């Protein structure tokens, strides 16, 4: 079985070498995340080159995600690198930069004084230190606070203001420079930090459009109350979400985070947009070779919630066991997926879905694939939308996306249950189906004889036109004739031109291939699993006997006795009147 949940790994000092990246890819990494809160362009450029080299060596499709620093508020530097703030003491926050002391610090956002009011809470260093606003002195440019929770405050720590709408820009100048660097480097995703409203996403989209890079997808990171409140408009503008539980858990009470996680995942699922669950998933594996039981449950529950991808941060960027962390996540995901109730999920999502043609096809494909227990769903695609829409219904069968576009292939690295295979561009429907089936076989996920569902859009090459579904047997069609009965049979051919030859050669379960049958052949026919004759006619002896015995018969197959060889393994499909090479899964 192949894992369907995707794994995002943050690349850092512990994982940036080509050899280590190869190990991560072989362990199961699908997307490499680069955190632009740390490091410069030169450092990230080297990492991107190493990721590409490792992907080339392994022959795997691995996407690159650029995670922006975002418009966050931080403290400036402290005296001697750190100060101690004591509970109950007064602390002044200056809007002008000063070197921090236990009496006064400054922040990177001068407009904070306009956004907060008396009684507001200000959190420092991921909420470890909390302050309450006592007074706001706009003339002096200072906020006077009382320390509610003390602790040691170091340089450049994060500042959060729960429940307060801050007027930070959508993207900063640093973000803009980082995104332009990413465009030049050919990245696949931008994870936009601290998204609060749809306009934050559109600001990035405009930048991409101005540089002819609209193919790069935007994943909105939901990290604050405002982002949660505006989730519907954000999802309309973004290509997917990241549930960034770290910063979210600072601004929102810890007990609310699991509920918000479920809400955000469900909203993405309903729209068929990918969602990543992130932060502290296997946090203890930064130091230990095994996860805690709570962490294993956390990963499993995110998958039960419906996440497309699970993410590793410090575990792979700076931890002692980066490869082990990926292997562990792979095993947890694989085992959890075996417990998914695909029929229940499909039924629920069908009720909640929209009434579009693509949605209707997506539902039909998932239902058909489940009812027929097909080996795979094959989706030739130009834009990646078809496999994404099918994945929305969480089919049991793997989804093989066949595309001529390498960038589309990488974008699908984030979508649940989708495996990609590149194939040449085609112009006709017949060519598209042939190329898709060939690519599916090359992927190793299906083999000759397997039953698959193919879904695509016609005319070929048009984006967003998913309107076709075909149930297909991947097999070599050897012969066609008039089928009798709806059954199918698999066995070894027994070629006999006379009754005597048939009686001598026939074995139980063999498939009798002859010119025509008569009463003298009955001892051989009674052992047969199926009959193929050159003689045609629905009232021929073979047709009548086959119906009587309840075995499939195909009549009117030209040159059958020379076409088939003794002992050749074949499948007879009475309903379709076809004979396939080998063991084919026919209905």
From Swiss-Prot:
Site feature location: Transition state stabilizer: 221
Binding site for K(+): 35, 37, 67-68
InterPro entries named in the record: PEP-util_enz_mobile_dom, Phosphohistidine_dom_sf, Pyr_Knase, Pyrv/PenolPyrv_kinase-like_dom, Pyrv_kinase-like_dom_sf, Pyrv_Knase-like_insert_dom_sf, Pyrv_Knase_AS, Pyrv_Knase_brl
Pfam families: PEP-utilizers, PK, PK_C
Post-translational modification: The N-terminus is blocked.
Keyword Plastid annotated: no
EC number per UniProt: 2.7.1.40
Cofactor binding comment, as recorded: Can also use manganese or cobalt. Can also use ammonium ions.
Keywords from the named record: Allosteric enzyme, ATP-binding, Glycolysis, Kinase, Magnesium, Metal-binding, Nucleotide-binding, Potassium, Pyruvate, Transferase
Record annotation: effect of changing residue 435 to E/K/R: Does not affect kinetic properties
Catalytic activity from the UniProt record: pyruvate + ATP = phosphoenolpyruvate + ADP + H(+)
The organism's place on the tree of life at top rank: Bacteria
Binding site for ATP: 35-38, 74, 157
Record field: pH dependence: Optimum pH is 7.2 at 30 degrees Celsius. Optimum pH is 6.8 at 60 degrees Celsius.
Pathway assigned in UniProt: Carbohydrate degradation; glycolysis; pyruvate from D-glyceraldehyde 3-phosphate: step 5/5
Substitution effect: residue 221 to C/D/L/R: 10000 to 100000-fold decrease in activity
Modes of activity regulation: Exhibits homotropic positive cooperativity for PEP. Allosterically activated by ribose-5-phosphate, AMP and other nucleoside monophosphates but not by fructose-1,6-bisphosphate.
Needed cofactors: Mg(2+); K(+)
PROSITE patterns named in the record: PYRUVATE_KINASE
Binding site for substrate: 33, 221, 246-247, 279
GO molecular function annotation: ATP binding; kinase activity; magnesium ion binding; potassium ion binding; pyruvate kinase activity
UniProt record similarity statement: Belongs to the pyruvate kinase family.
Subunit structure: Homotetramer.
Alphabetical list of NCBIfam families matching this protein: PRK05826.1, PRK06354.1, pyruv_kin
Function: Catalyzes the phosphoryl transfer from phosphoenolpyruvate (PEP) to ADP to form pyruvate and ATP. Has a broad specificity for nucleoside diphosphates and can use ADP, GDP, IDP and UDP.
This protein's name: Pyruvate kinase
Organism: Geobacillus stearothermophilus
């Amino acid at each position: 079985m192949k894992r369907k949940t995707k794994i995002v790994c943050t690349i850092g000092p512990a994982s940036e070498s080509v050899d280590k990246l190869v190990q991560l890819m072989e362990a199961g990494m699908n997307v490499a995340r680069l955190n632009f809160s740390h490091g410069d362009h030169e450092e990230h450029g080297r990492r991107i080159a190493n990721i590409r080299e490792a992907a080339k060596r392994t022959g795997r499709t691995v996407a690159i995600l650029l995670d922006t620093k975002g418009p966050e508020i931080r403290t400036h530097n402290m005296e001697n690198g750190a100060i101690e703030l004591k509970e109950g003491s007064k602390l002044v926050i200056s809007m002008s930069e000063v070197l921090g002391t236990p009496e006064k610090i400054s922040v990177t956002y001068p407009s904070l004084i306009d956004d907060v009011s008396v009684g507001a809470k200000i959190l420092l260093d991921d909420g470890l230190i909390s302050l309450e606003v006592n007074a706001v002195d706009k003339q002096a440019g200072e906020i006077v606070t009382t320390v509610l929770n003390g602790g040691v405050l170091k340089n450049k720590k994060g500042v959060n203001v729960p429940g307060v709408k801050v007027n930070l820009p959508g993207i900063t100048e640093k973000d803009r420079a980082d995104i332009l660097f990413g465009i030049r480097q050919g990245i696949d995703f931008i994870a936009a930090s601290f998204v609060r409203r749809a306009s934050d996403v559109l600001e990035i989209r405009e930048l991409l459009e101005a540089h002819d890079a609209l193919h790069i997808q935007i994943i909105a990171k939901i990290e604050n109350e405002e982002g949660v409140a505006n989730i519907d408009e954000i999802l309309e503008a973004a290509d997917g979400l990241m549930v960034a539980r770290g910063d979210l858990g600072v601004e929102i009470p810890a007990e609310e985070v699991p509920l918000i996680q479920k809400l955000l995942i469900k909203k993405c699922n309903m729209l068929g947009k990918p969602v990543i669950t992130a932060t502290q998933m296997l946090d203890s594996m930064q130091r230990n070779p095994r996860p805690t039981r709570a962490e294993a449950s956390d990963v499993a529950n995110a998958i039960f919630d419906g996440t497309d991808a699970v993410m590793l941060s410090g575990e792979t960027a700076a931890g002692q066991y980066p490869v082990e962390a990926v292997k562990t996540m792979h095993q947890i995901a694989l085992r959890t997926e075996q417990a998914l109730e695909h029929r229940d999920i499909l039924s629920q999502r069908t009720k909640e879905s929209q009434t579009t043609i693509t949605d209707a096809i997506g539902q039909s494909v998932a239902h058909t694939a489940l009812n027929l227990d097909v080996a795979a769903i094959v989706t030739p695609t130009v834009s990646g939308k078809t496999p994404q829409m099918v994945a929305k219904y969480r089919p049991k069968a793997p989804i093989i996306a066949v595309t001529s576009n390498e960038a589309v292939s990488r974008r699908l690295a984030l979508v649940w249950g989708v495996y990609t295979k590149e194939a040449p561009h085609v112009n006709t429907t017949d060519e598209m189906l042939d190329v898709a089936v060939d690519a599916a076989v090359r992927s190793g996920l299906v083999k000759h004889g397997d039953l698959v569902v193919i879904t695509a859009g016609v005319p070929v090459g048009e984006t967003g036109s998913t309107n076709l579904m075909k149930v297909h047997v991947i097999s070599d069609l050897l012969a066609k004739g008039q089928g009798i009965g709806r059954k199918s049979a698999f066995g070894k051919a027994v070629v006999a031109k006379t009754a005597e030859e048939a009686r001598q050669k026939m074995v139980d379960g063999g498939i009798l291939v002859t010119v025509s049958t008569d009463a003298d052949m009955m001892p051989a026919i009674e052992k047969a699993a199926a009959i193929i004759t050159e003689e045609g006619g629905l009232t021929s002896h073979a047709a009548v006997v086959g119906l009587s015995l309840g075995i499939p018969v195909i009549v009117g197959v030209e040159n059958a006795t020379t076409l088939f060889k003794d002992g050749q393994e074949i499948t007879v499909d009475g309903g379709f009147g076809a004979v396939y090479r080998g063991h084919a899964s026919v209905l």
